[in-house]
């Protein structure tokens, strides 16, 4: 690849090329004229890995080919450019590019200079452009799958659509065909060590900080640093090195020891910047599309903040972008989808070949990269770079910290790196937590921050998470997605507003939440980090190894622990809130096996944490909350207690509801002249008995499956179970509708509801002797009516039409399948870490003495800028390539202790025993011999009255909490500071 001939190398006087290459191809990249020509250009220095990249063609991705997106005046395919005249050190012949194919004149048309020399000729003097990236658009370009070298007719001019159907033959190739993604990535980590780049690299000696901390600055590719707009590069508070050099630090310590005293530091602190907002993106094994969705959405949100015009805060004390830091924390090298590294390298916050597995024999715990970038990649594998013609639409510079943990040590450990390591150095006011795959909506992060800015007692907050439904809502055709969509929506409409009104939101989803940093410091984080297995030895009995199975299940819902500890913090009055204006989008499980596996963790963790918060409610008295807040917290305590009891007996409740309604509708009643419905007096009872036994058989099957099978190993059986329980529930809904119709038509309505007096009217609904119409009206209004009313008041009612019906059909599966599986796998808590086989392939950093024999230094290969740019070319091709299908992840073998299984067995027995006792008490007459005077036909209606009245009360409480939240939100919008 070409570079500025006036400033070769990467020294302090390096003069980078003024024009950014049109990524990912075009003049910016070289294409071999033929195999013979390409072979002639191979470096004489032997490299066992490099030839593979130059000789093999990448395989076409699995699945359908992605089309090249349509272009308009604001979106230009980066594969296109104006190709007039020579385009680099080697001229373009209409069919191929030379090895060095871009220079200052490669990305736009330059006229002849004053001496008559043409662009690309020796001695040509390039004019100084107005912007470093000439004529660049806010380009969101996607690399399509191509299989031949382009001709001049293929390329077109600026902004034209590319007509080449195939394009890979003739471009620099990779090892993808011979090696899988992981092997290719491991090879790239050794290239610098084995071959010294392209054979022209030198070595440099890097001094260690305090003799032990390895921190090195690496030049970034020319394309990335030239993408930065001049107004930012030379703006107030900007530092040249943050745009031209990527900083790498090999942290060989525990997060608690990552301190200034021990020689560790971060660029925002080094530049003496105040960090107002620390945005953390936690990653496990998501693909590059999911990561790009989160990363690009975050950068768009930062643009929303930077572009604020009337803000009293962000426009003072320096540029807004310098007050924001984005931190990516990856949980272990082994689990990472290696394609993700190419996306990060394209942005500029990662480079191959710089990772060090140890420093002088001391194992690296985390690899930390720092860079400030103005480049982004969209989920559609399109590249976004600045457009000088539309600066308000450009993404601002973003300060990135990329923490790649060497071993997989779970999410809590990732948060320990975030809060204890980076947080203590940066000392942010607000920390926002986002899971990879969650896309923050427009101004979502700004809305979260404004909640803290306008409420000094707000300790934590969350926004609305909604389900990704696909184009035109096509994913709603999957009933599991529709059910989860309704669940998310109704939680945002009723549950979160109610808890926000009380001041204690039981769970701020880790996928999209925010905390005031000084609020969670101290005991909240201390208790939270007890779940970090890397601290198990130092914590002893307080650590994860010393916990019983109940507490270990609590840490399956680790975000709930942080919420409770924050509200109950001694002598403090922090409260939690839900912020309606902040919205995030996430994907949900689409298959039965994935859905069951996810809910096992959620149900067990939330149930254990609910019991913990109820048992430790007394800690609220030691907090600094006033009497009014404590009063409402007591109401919430009762509300949560009732919900826990309902959950515990829900297995029996669904069975009783199913069997009793079938009995009421299907059994002929001669005195009342009611016939069996819907199949007649003879067939209906038989059908109902068959359905009853099918219900019991499939319920027993769930226990068998849960005790002996993984969901993925029995996914077809689980799909059948969902279908069976769904059909039974649908049949039950039809019978319920008929029962309601019969209640209103069998006895005149005026005889059931009296308007003679207030007492008579009250008795019509709660007296129990004047008919069931009043009770049915209460049930219909509170269970269905309030949901519709609240959704319309929330201005988001559509889920009640396209998702509510599916939820009604499948709601019994939440108990009969999900809860049964969760309780039967209560023992399934795995906390162990796996060693990193991938990390073993990384090079080491060996400490030597300097020439004077005094200071400790590390010898590091120093690559030429041309080599960096050449490798970057291949990185972008990989990053923007359509994503191939991923192989199914292999399950980990788990060693479960017998004590955990014993506890699980006891829990399941107790749960079943309680539910069986409830069923027997309600439905059998055998208790008459024990002195119980009322028969089953009397106890059954009483049970249903209590159940319906309790449900109605809970629904009314939720609705009033919703009304209070809506009113308060409307008022705050009028008086909030910006």
Swiss-Prot record:
Looking up Pfam families in the UniProt record yields: Chitin_synth_1 (PF01644), Chitin_synth_1N (PF08407)
Q: What happens when the gene is disrupted?
A: Leads to lethality.
* Superkingdom per UniProt: Eukaryota
Q: Which reaction does it catalyse?
A: [(1->4)-N-acetyl-beta-D-glucosaminyl](n) + UDP-N-acetyl-alpha-D-glucosamine = [(1->4)-N-acetyl-beta-D-glucosaminyl](n+1) + UDP + H(+)
First-tier enzyme category under EC: transferase
Q: Recorded GO terms, molecular function?
A: chitin synthase activity
TM spans (from-to): 641-661, 686-706, 719-739, 775-795, 803-823, 908-928, 946-966
Tell me, what is an example of a GO biological process annotation in this record?
A: cell wall organization
Q: What is its EC number?
A: 2.4.1.16
Instruction: Enumerate the glycosylated residues.
Output: 72, 604
What keywords sit in the KW lines? Cell membrane, Cell wall biogenesis/degradation, Glycoprotein, Glycosyltransferase, Membrane, Transferase, Transmembrane, Transmembrane helix
Compositional bias, Low complexity, is annotated for 1-13
GO CC terms: cell septum; plasma membrane
Q: Identify the stretch(es) annotated as Disordered.
A: 1-95, 108-127
The membrane topology term of the UniProt record is:
Multi-pass membrane protein
Subcellular localization? Cell membrane
Role according to the record: Polymerizes chitin, a structural polymer of the cell wall and septum, by transferring the sugar moiety of UDP-GlcNAc to the non-reducing end of the growing chitin polymer. Is essential for viability.
Q: Which family does it belong to?
A: Belongs to the chitin synthase family. Class III subfamily.
- Name assigned to this protein: Chitin synthase 3
- The organism named in the record is Fusarium oxysporum f. sp. lycopersici (strain 4287 / CBS 123668 / FGSC 9935 / NRRL 34936) (Fusarium vascular wilt of tomato)
Organism lineage string: Eukaryota, Fungi, Dikarya, Ascomycota, Pezizomycotina
What gene name is given for the protein in this entry? Answer: chs3
């Amino acid at each position: 690849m070409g570079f500025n001939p006036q400033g070769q190398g990467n020294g302090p006087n390096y003069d980078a090329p003024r024009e950014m290459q049109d990524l990912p191809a075009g003049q910016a990249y070289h294409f071999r004229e033929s195999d013979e020509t390409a072979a002639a250009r191979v470096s004489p220095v032997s490299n066992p890995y490099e030839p593979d990249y130059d000789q093999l063609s990448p395989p076409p991705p699995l699945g359908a080919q992605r089309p090249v997106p349509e272009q308009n005046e604001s979106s230009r395919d980066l594969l296109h450019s104006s190709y007039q005249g020579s385009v680099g050190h080697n001229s373009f012949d209409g069919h191929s590019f030379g090895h060095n194919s871009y220079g200052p004149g490669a990305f736009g048309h330059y006229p002849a200079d004053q001496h008559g020399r043409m662009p690309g000729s020796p001695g040509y003097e390039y004019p100084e452009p107005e912007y470093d990236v000439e004529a660049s658009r806010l380009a969101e370009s996607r690399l399509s799958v191509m299989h031949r070298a382009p001709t001049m007719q293929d390329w077109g001019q600026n902004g034209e659509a590319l007509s080449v159907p195939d394009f890979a033959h003739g471009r620099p190739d990779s090892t993808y065909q011979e090696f899988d993604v992981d092997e290719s990535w491991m090879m790239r980590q050794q290239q610098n060590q084995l071959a010294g780049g392209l054979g022209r690299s030198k070595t440099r000696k890097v001094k260690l900080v305090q003799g032990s901390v390895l921190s090195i600055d690496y030049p970034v590719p020319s394309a990335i640093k030239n993408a930065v707009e001049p107004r930012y590069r030379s703006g107030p508070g900007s530092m040249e090195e943050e745009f031209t050099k990527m900083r790498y630090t090999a942290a060989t310590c525990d997060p608690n020891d990552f301190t200034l005293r021990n020689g560790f530091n971060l660029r925002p602190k080094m530049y003496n910047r105040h960090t107002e907002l620390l945005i953390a993106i936690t990653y496990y094994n998501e693909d590059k599309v999911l990561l790009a969705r989160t990363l690009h959405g975050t950068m768009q949100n930062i643009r929303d903040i930077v572009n604020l015009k009337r803000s009293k805060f962000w426009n003072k004390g320096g540029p807004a972008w310098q007050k924001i830091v984005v931190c990516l924390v990856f949980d272990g090298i082994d689990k990472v989808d290696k394609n993700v590294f190419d996306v990060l390298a394209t942005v500029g916050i990662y480079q191959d070949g710089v990772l060090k597995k140890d420093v002088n024999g001391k194992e690296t715990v985390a690899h930390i990269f720092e860079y400030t970038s103005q480049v982004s990649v969209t989920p559609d594998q399109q590249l976004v770079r600045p457009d000088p013609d539309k600066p308000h639409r450009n993404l601002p510079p973003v300060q990135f910290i990329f923490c790649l943990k060497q071993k997989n040590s779970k999410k809590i450990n990732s948060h320990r790196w975030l809060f204890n390591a980076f947080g203590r150095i940066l000392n942010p006011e607000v920390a926002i937590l986002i899971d990879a795959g969650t896309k923050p909506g427009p101004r979502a992060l700004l809305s979260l921050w404004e909640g803290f800015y306008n409420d000094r007692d707000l300790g934590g907050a969350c926004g609305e998470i909604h389900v990704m439904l696909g184009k035109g809502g096509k994913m709603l055709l999957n009933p599991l997605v529709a059910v989860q969509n309704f669940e998310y929506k109704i939680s945002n409409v009723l549950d979160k507003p109610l808890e926000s009104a009380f001041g204690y939101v039981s769970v701020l989803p880790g996928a999209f939440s925010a905390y005031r940093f000084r609020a969670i410091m101290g005991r909240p984080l201390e208790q939270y980090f007890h779940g970090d297995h890397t601290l198990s030895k130092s914590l002893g009995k307080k650590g994860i190894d010393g916990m019983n199975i109940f507490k270990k299940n609590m840490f399956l819902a680790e975000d709930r622990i942080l919420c409770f500890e924050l509200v109950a913090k001694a002598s403090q009055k922090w409260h939690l809130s839900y912020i309606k204006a902040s919205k995030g989008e996430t994907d949900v499980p689409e298959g039965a096996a994935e859905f069951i596996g996810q809910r096992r963790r959620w149900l067990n963790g939330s149930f254990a944490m609910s019991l913990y918060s109820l048992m430790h409610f007394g800690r609220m008295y030691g907090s600094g909350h006033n009497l009014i807040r404590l009063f409402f917290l007591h109401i919430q305590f009762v509300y949560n207690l009732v919900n826990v009891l309902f959950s515990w007996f829900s297995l029996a409740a669904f069975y009783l509801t199913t069997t009793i309604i079938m009995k009421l509708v299907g059994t002929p009643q001669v005195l009342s002249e009611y016939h069996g419905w819907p199949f007649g007096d003879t067939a209906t009872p038989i059908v109902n008995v068959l359905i009853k036994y099918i219900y019991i058989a499939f319920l027993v099957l769930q226990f068998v499956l849960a005790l002996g099978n993984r969901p993925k190993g029995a996914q077809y059986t689980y799909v059948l179970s969902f279908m069976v329980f769904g059909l039974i529930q649908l049949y039950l809904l039809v019978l319920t509708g008929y029962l309601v119709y019969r209640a209103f038509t069998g006895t005149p309505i005026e005889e059931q509801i009296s308007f003679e007096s207030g007492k008579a009217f009250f008795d019509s609904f709660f007296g129990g002797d004047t008919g069931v119409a009043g009770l049915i009206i209460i049930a219909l209004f509170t269970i269905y009516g309030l949901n519709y009313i609240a959704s319309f008041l929330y201005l988001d009612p559509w889920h009640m039409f396209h998702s509510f019906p599916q939820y009604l059909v499948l709601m019994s599966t939440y108990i009969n399948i999900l809860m049964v599986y969760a309780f039967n796998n209560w023992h399934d808590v795995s906390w162990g870490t796996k060693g990193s086989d991938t990390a073993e392939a990384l090079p080491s950093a060996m400490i030597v003495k300097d020439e004077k024999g005094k200071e400790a230094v590390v010898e590091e290969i120093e690559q030429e800028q041309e080599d960096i740019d050449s490798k970057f070319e291949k990185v972008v091709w990989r990053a923007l390539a359509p994503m191939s299908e991923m192989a199914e992840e292999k399950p980990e073998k788990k060693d479960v202790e017998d004590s955990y299984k014993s506890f699980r067995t006891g829990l399941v027995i107790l749960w079943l025993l309680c539910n069986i006792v409830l069923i027997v008490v309600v439905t059998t007459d055998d208790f008459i011999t024990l002195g119980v005077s009322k028969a089953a036909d009397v106890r059954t209606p009483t049970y249903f009255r209590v159940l319906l009245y309790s449900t109605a009360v809970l629904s009314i409480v939720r609705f009033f909490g919703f009304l209070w939240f809506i009113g308060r939100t409307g008022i705050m919008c009028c008086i909030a500071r910006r």
